[in-house]
Structures are given as C-alpha cells and as structure tokens.
Amino acid sequence: MSDAFDINDLKRRMEGAINSLKHDLNGLRTGRASASLLEPIVIEAYGSTMPINQVANITVPESRMLSVSVWDKSMVGAVERAIRDSGLGLNPITDGTTLRIPLPELNEQRRKELVKIAHQYAEQGRIAARHVRRDGMDTLKKLEKDSLISQDDGRVLSEKVQKLTDETIAEMDKVVAVKEGEIMQV
C-alpha cells in the first residue's frame, strides 16, 4: 500500500464526528439530572459571553435536581436569566449564590420532540461521516490518477474507507438508540 494515503486520519475525523454527536446528545434532557444539560448555556459576564461552567460549579445533589453555585455574587442574576432563557424549560430557585434547579417530569409530547431532535443530530453526524468518506475517496482517485497508487491498491483502500464509514454510522446509530431509550424511559 501507499504512504501517500493515511486512513488513520480518516479514522480520527470519523471518531471526531462520533464524539461531536455524543456531545450534542448530552445536551438533550432526559428524565435524570445531568450537569452536561447546562453546558451549552452561555452567560453575559464581564463584557463578554462565557460558558456557565466558567462562572459557576454545577452539581447533581438529587436525581431530579441540579445545583449551580455561582462564584461571583454579582453574576447570580445573569446566570438565572440565562438558564430561564435557555429554552430547556427550567426555572431556577435562587438561594444566595446557589441556584437550585428542579427538573420537571417530561411529558410524552416533549419526549417525542427530544427523540426527533436526537435523530436530527444523528443525521448531521452521518452526513459528517459521509463527508469524511468523500474526502478519502477523492484523495484515492487523485492518487490513482497521478499514478501514486495502483488501481488494485486504490480499490482495497476504498473498500477500507467504506467499511470505516459503515462502522462509524453503525456506532452513531447505537449511540442514538441508547439516548432514545433514556429519553423515552418514564
């Protein structure tokens, strides 16, 4: 085979697509409390925007409760506002510099909406994996055209790229199925 084609680079990029999908899915609310639920929230602080985890500590004291301990007392209002406006349907209760956030039960309609969103994230992940595959295939065609690899080597490598893509998409489907199970669990 040729040193001109690096399949490990494609593996890294596809693993990146899987990790991105996992990160996106962590932001979806399930029935259980999770500190990662608040990760996407950004706060207007000190003249700029910053992630909530840079102005507060997030803990899970109970299965349906989040606790946000704000480090700077002057930031409590901004953190509370950002959580309310996040679109997650959360209403923090302020207690000094600590915000307690009870997680209400998800109704059936909201669960189905979250499953749809999870499937949209999965489709974005599959598209990203296919883009990586396309880049790999284009590179192989160029190497073949420039006579840097033989047609046989090109065919073998393109089969490896396709197999890698199939495995990546299967892994994404598994990740989404697990998340769907968590969301639909009552």
From Swiss-Prot:
Keywords: Cytoplasm, Protein biosynthesis. Gene3D superfamilies: 3.30.1360.40, Ribosome-recycling factor. GO terms for molecular function: ribosomal large subunit binding. Its main location: cytoplasm. It is found in: Cytoplasm. The keyword DNA-binding does not apply. PANTHER family: MITOCHONDRIAL RIBOSOME RECYCLING FACTOR PSEUDO 1, RIBOSOME RECYCLING FACTOR. Belongs to the RRF family. This is Ribosome-recycling factor. The gene is frr.
